[in-house]
Amino acid sequence: MKAMILAAGKGTRVRPITHTIPKPMIPILQKPVMEFLLELLRQHGFDQIMVNVSHLAEEIESYFRDGQRFGVQIAYSFEGNIVDGDLVGKALGSAGGLKKIQEFNPFFDDTFVVLCGDALIDLDLTTAVKLHREKGAIATIITKTVPQELVSSYGVVVTDDNGKILTFQEKPAVEEALSTEINTGIYIFEPEVIDYIPSGQEYDLGGDLFPKLVDSGLPFYAVNMDFEWVDIGKVPDYWQAIRGVLSREIKNVQIPGIEVRPGVYTGINVAANWDNIEIEGPVYIGGMTRIEDGVKIIGPSMIGPSCLICQGAVVDNSVIFEYSRLGPGARLVDKLVFGRYCVDKTGAAIDVQAAALDWLITDARHAAVQYRQEYPSQREISKLLQPE
């Protein structure tokens, strides 16, 4: 069976992470989100998978290649051009990407599934396809019910009593929402649906194609299913995903490594004298990381591989990516550290290098950074990283 993973977006709402990592490659405890999707697809018999790529396409292609080591076949559709010797992505939209593939050569010749490349799911795809076919649908959206107070964060789907889609509401105010069913970005299509997508232009599934299907009166349905769905569309979403995995609220992701203390998991060759470290799980620490004496770590927290957490530092409810160095005495509370950026839970970021705060946070591969006199502006910024 055939499927498509949408992986061409720039991921602007997950910046600064997506400056160097495309959204499908964002790691959940060192494993890219898209790898979980491939495992799910393979489990349900989808072994021919098309992936549209654009932003940082080479990162996705070089990791997954032709899919052999994941037990599937993968091919890529690049959206963009070479301009002045540089590869420049230009995404065609979620529907435009489908059209490009089908016009190249009719790949989709039977019922197929489309997944967004930035979500963790454990959906029973076999049952979903069965329900789609039973309804005689040309297109089906998998929906999920959320509490009324959360509908304003999602695209709301409004249906009749038989599940046929009547209209959509994009992030409506709570009091204006006509439904609590939301679009999860999981779709089941018949090949004929691609005939409704125009050629050679940017075209979106939700904003363009779906309203056209409704207006045309086509058999377009929503199927509401109960499953685990963790969207990673924004920095706060990613934060919650990591917390959910560490706290075992997300059941379909296992914590890797070995448990060295209750609730404390590590990769191989972590250098730490646990008797001289105050640590409270759940915590994951990647391999080849050094934790110096006097460090305090409070979970849920994740420290990536090849990091250095210096003496007296505090890591509290935080996520630290690989090759990060947290300086002596630094206090990191409710923060995400990615390269030269320190990000809070709302997504607001500080460029620690531009702020000359590399004595506090830097790349662990640099030579040791010495403490130096701070300027007032630096002191004010550092307070954001070291809340009381």
Curated annotation (Swiss-Prot):
Entry's Gene Ontology BP terms: biosynthetic process; UDP-alpha-D-glucose metabolic process
Function (record text): Catalyzes the formation of UDP-glucose, from UTP and glucose 1-phosphate. Is highly specific since it cannot use other NTPs such as dTTP, CTP, ATP, and GTP, and other sugar-1P such as GlcNAc-1P, Gal-1P, and Man-1P, as substrates. Has probably a central and essential role as the substrate supplier for galactolipid synthesis; galactolipids are major constituents of the photosynthetic thylakoid membrane and important for photosynthetic activity.
Organism annotation: Synechocystis sp. (strain ATCC 27184 / PCC 6803 / Kazusa)
Keywords, in A-Z order: Magnesium, Metal-binding, Nucleotidyltransferase, Transferase
Miscellaneous remark of the record: The CugP-type UDP-Glc PPase appears to be present in all cyanobacteria, whereas the GalU-type UDP-Glc PPase is present in only certain cyanobacterial species. Moreover, the GalU-type PPase is found to be widely distributed throughout the bacterial kingdom, whereas the CugP-type can be found in only very limited species other than cyanobacteria.
Catalysed reactions, as listed in the record: alpha-D-glucose 1-phosphate + UTP + H(+) = UDP-alpha-D-glucose + diphosphate
Cofactor(s) demanded: Mg(2+)
Family membership: Belongs to the CugP-type UDP-glucose pyrophosphorylase family.
Pfam families linked: NTP_transferase
Protein residues bound to Mg(2+): D118
InterPro entries per record: CugP_cyano (IPR037538), Mannose-1P_guanyltransferase (IPR050486), NTP_transferase_dom (IPR005835), Nucleotide-diphossugar_trans (IPR029044)
Gene3D superfamilies in UniProt: Hexapeptide repeat proteins, Spore Coat Polysaccharide Biosynthesis Protein SpsA, Chain A
Protein name: UTP--glucose-1-phosphate uridylyltransferase
UniProt note: phenotype after gene disruption: Complete disruption of this gene could not be achieved, suggesting that the CugP-type UDP-Glc PPase is essential for growth and survival of Synechocystis.
A GO MF label: UTP:glucose-1-phosphate uridylyltransferase activity
CDD domains found in the cross-reference section: NTP_transferase (cd04181)
Record keyword Magnesium present: yes
GO cellular component: cytoplasm
Entry's EC annotation: 2.7.7.9
